[in-house]
Amino acid sequence: MGQALRKLTAADYPVVVQEPRKKVLAVKGLVKAYKSQHRVLDNINFELHAGEFVAIIGRSGAGKSTLLHILNGTIPTSAGEIINYHENGDTQNIAALTTKQMRKWRAKCGMIFQDFCLVPRLDVITNVLLGRLSYTSTLKSFFKLFSEQDQARAIELLQWLNMLPHALQRAENLSGGQMQRVAICRAMMQNPKILLADEPVASLDPKNTTRIMNTLQKISENDIAVIVNLHSVDLVKDYCTRVIGIAHGRIIFDGPPSMLNDSIIQDIYSDESAELLH
């Protein structure tokens, strides 16, 4: 007779322990107000971890784009801190950086836009190479020659997004989807740890929308934190791992897309939420 079967226990199965994702950024008490004293952003608090794919949603004028530009350093804060966590454990308040220090920060915090922001008359590969200049002064940028390493990186990125055949084509002759792929390549030239995307698919057709969202998802899967400003809740649920809902300058929801029900969506997009916040 064969050997009696032994009852399997938990000890027979390998235990897979997932390491907590690295914290890359913490926003604390962020406020943005203009001369009218109107607070576009009011007491914004959240943490960001490597590999997260975070959607920012809300009505037009809720402060979504302003938040992304503040994180990138192109708009100053009125109050609060933006803490950058370095690999060695050191921290740095982005909101207090000098102009020179801010250029170095932008090398680690790439950004793409709805209108692509390419130089129309330059060819594709030169537009991508311009991503290497974000950390240098404007004057030095005009006289800096791109290294062979820079050129190899640009070619690698263009090949990754199937844009290498268009490398010598002027940017103005590309389609919207192609322009956004070039913009992503440019943002990735510095190997950023954070990628900000301000309405990256707002002007694209469904096919190119899917392509760009798939690309952003792949980027996040490579331990890069991605924050995207989106209008489509369906895209948020299909692609993102986390949602931050902003209404009238304040965060009223922060959680996984699975918790984003009709009631919460209505609160985020309804004018009635203003009465609850003020």
From Swiss-Prot:
One of its GO terms (molecular function) is ATP hydrolysis activity. Keywords: ATP-binding, Cell inner membrane, Cell membrane, Membrane, Nucleotide-binding, Phosphonate transport, Translocase, Transport. Residues 25-273 form the ABC transporter domain. Its EC number is 7.3.2.2. It is a peripheral membrane protein. Pfam families: ABC_tran. One of its GO terms (cellular component) is plasma membrane. SMART domains: AAA. The keyword Coiled coil does not apply. It is found in: Cell inner membrane. ATP binds at G58, R59, S60, G61, A62, G63, K64, S65. It catalyses: phosphonate(out) + ATP + H2O = phosphonate(in) + ADP + phosphate + H(+). The complex is composed of two ATP-binding proteins (PhnC), two transmembrane proteins (PhnE) and a solute-binding protein (PhnD). Belongs to the ABC transporter superfamily. Phosphonates importer (TC 3.A.1.9.1) family. Part of the ABC transporter complex PhnCDE involved in phosphonates import. Responsible for energy coupling to the transport system. This is Phosphonates import ATP-binding protein PhnC.
